[in-house]
Amino acid sequence: MLLQQRKISVCIGALFGSLFLGSTASAQLSPPSDYGQKIGDVVVSATRSGTELKDMTQNTSVITSEDLQNAPNQTVDQVLKNQSSVFLNDQPYYEKDPTGQSINVRGLGNARTLVLIDGVPANDAMYGTVQWNLVPLSSIEDVEFIRGGVSNLYGNYGMGGVINIKTKKINDTGGEVSGSYGTFNTSNIAASKDLKVNDVLNLRISADLFNTDGYVQAANISPATSYPNRLKINGSYQNAPLLPGMGPEAAKSGNYRLQGDLKFSGDTTGFFNLGYHSMSNLTPGGYSGITKSTEESTFAGGVKTLIDADSDVKVNAFYENTSLWQQNATNPISSTTGTVTGPYYIGSNYNDPYYTLGASAQYTNNVKASLLDQVVLSADARQNSASNNSNTLSATGVSIGTAYAQGQQQFYGLMGQLKSKLDVIPLEATLAARVDQYQSQVPTYWSGGANGSNPLYTNAPNVSATKLSPNLGLLYQATKELDFRGAVYQGFHAPGLNNLIRSYGAPGSSYSFSNPALTPENMFGYELGSDYRWNSGFVQVTGYVAQVSNAVVATTMTPGSATWNSVCNAALQCSSTSTIYGNSQSLQSSGLELQAHYDISSKWATDGTYTHTNTVLTWLGAGVSPTLNPTGSQLGGVPQNMGTVGITYYPTSKANITANVRYIGNSWMDTQHTLPVPSYATLGARANYEMTPGTTLFLSVVNLLNRNYISYAASTSQTGYIVGQPQTVTVGARVVF
């Protein structure tokens, strides 16, 4: 290990040192004027109305192409984790279970924030998680991030905010090839080619491949215990996180895309995207030979027509078909000693085929009347459909329990938005409202014994709800540099199809049931903030409050109750620990957000963020333990204090070096506060060097000091303790032609 670290240090020193030897000729790596916040040029397309960044009434950030090129992290989720109010731990998405690759904004929980890729949803249609693998970092132009309620624009998923990942524009000709290699045998290759077919059509063909051997994630450092030692909480023993048989969690993925830009006339343009995406990784724990895999086929397309100089119509549609195959490992462990008593085996598997289909039409008119500047009207529809077939297996591979369900959801939305910019006083107002009709049906729902024997069929009711999502935003331009803003909003989040149809577990012990009768969650929130921008930087401060009611949570069933009798039978042998999802929690999150950037000189620039978050439960319904889920206690997996500081140095116009420090304060994995996560800080660095006008080399290091620490997470068991990403060195190159 010492020799390896010395080799790494030599490589880092050699490349960093070479940066000072470059020519001072003009190049792309030098900092642009008004770096990162060219207020007159930055338009936030995620608003659906082309709002300039300086006119946003909610806390908004734009991660520019320069930010992406300078970030030590090599995946978009790990770049986003350094933004204020983003709760993503120090574990890259490819090291997580496919059903756990989510994002939490403002402490409101996973699957409550919308993520878009060029305006098309990237949230998984069944689990609500984020398919981060669909777009590699090399394809991204910039990332727009609006915090706070956006259900007025998009309906479902709009509680925490919206993240819109924009890919690079297609050119008439040219292309790009990039590649990288690093620690844990991690490699990434990406290539794209643009070509002009004729005056109507421009195409881009692109592909990228990713592979890693991964690393061991289960923790064996304090406060976790080391095998075979156990931790006793609430009278029960919890096994050590790292058990015999566990290993590195390898992963690989591939993306293949065909994109097109169309210009039918001077007034009418269009686009289309076709893609095939695959990803597979070892099951959590890194059990060799037990894999999980996903395959997606995607399509998106749209047309925009200018009616006149001030108005246009857009029509878009998208489709995604996904197949998810999962296997889970079981390690036989003695309940009295906590020791492993035999080899691990495949304890369960399940197959989830599902799809999502949607379309929208939008009319925009920049009326520029005396009191009205813009009108936006929109209508959209979406359907999600899925089935789940879960099988529980014995150590010999024999089926001992089966559950099957099929369901679908429909969303129909109407949206209207008005914008006004007064001349008498420097006040801008945005008033938007959206009405959504939500429907869900689960026509098939049953659970049974071995190979589906003795099935118990449950009559699942159809669910329908109408949700109103208004939003009022105000912006007061006090001076050219200083503004004050505020917004109040209401939103909702429908239960995921996994909550409606996916039942799983071990018959006779712990079994978790889905609930087709779940209804949407509700959110009310408001925020106040201020932005100060000048030619050399900006400072943004925001305070917010958000309240979520009717939240979905796993509830413990009472033996013999009506709910128990509707899903449990003799073949399944439910136990006193069996759970079913219910709308049985309410929570409140409040906090302070700070973002800043400052160009110290033509050679030095610095960035910083800070987040303070208080997220607590405010109400518990039936089946939710007040001992495990006390009200008024900081929610597990939500650190109260987080911050980042970064600095970039440009020794020449062809080179730069970036270093950043990420700090996470003390937190807890559980809301009962029995599983602490100590505070930690990590250092990252990256160097870029332009060899020629079209060729750039880079070297990045995550966790530069190779600190061994536990990253924050949410769990009620110490088996949820995972280590943060170990020192990861990556060297790569990009060639643009």
Predicted regions and their residues:
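Transmembrane beta-barrel wall of Gram-negative outer-membrane proteins
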Residues: 183-212, 217, 221-280, 295-308, ...
